[in-house]
Amino acid sequence: MNVSVEYLGDKKFKANTIKSSYTLDCKEITPVEYFATGIIGCTGIDLVMMAEKDGYEVSNYSVKAEIERTDSVPMKFASMHIIFEFDGEFDATKAKRYIGASLESYCTTVNSIRDSVKVSYTIIQNGE
């Protein structure tokens, strides 16, 4: 994988990947917030892909993270609690299996921090 950023001025960067590009607005969102959203976005898409592979649709879906950081610089992540909230016609066992597979195997970003960050999660499926 190769990625790059180009400074555009005014604390904005153009982020480039082989597939696409997008603007990082560090005046509004910190790099740490981009990092955190990348982590939950990675595990979030895994649930959708696994459910679709099994013929299920996921709707009304959001993923949130509550993150605690250390007090001393560089203020690393100490813990991350991820909340998956969605509707889907598959049972709770499948939902837990999909999310567990993502967090323990498939999601590169989560697994890159797993050794140093306590990761936990909650599933809210169909309002329960």
Name each model-derived stretch:
Residues 1-37, 48-128:
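Extended beta-strand/beta-hairpin segments
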Residues 42-43:
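Alpha-helical metal-binding/catalytic segments enriched in His/Glu/Asp
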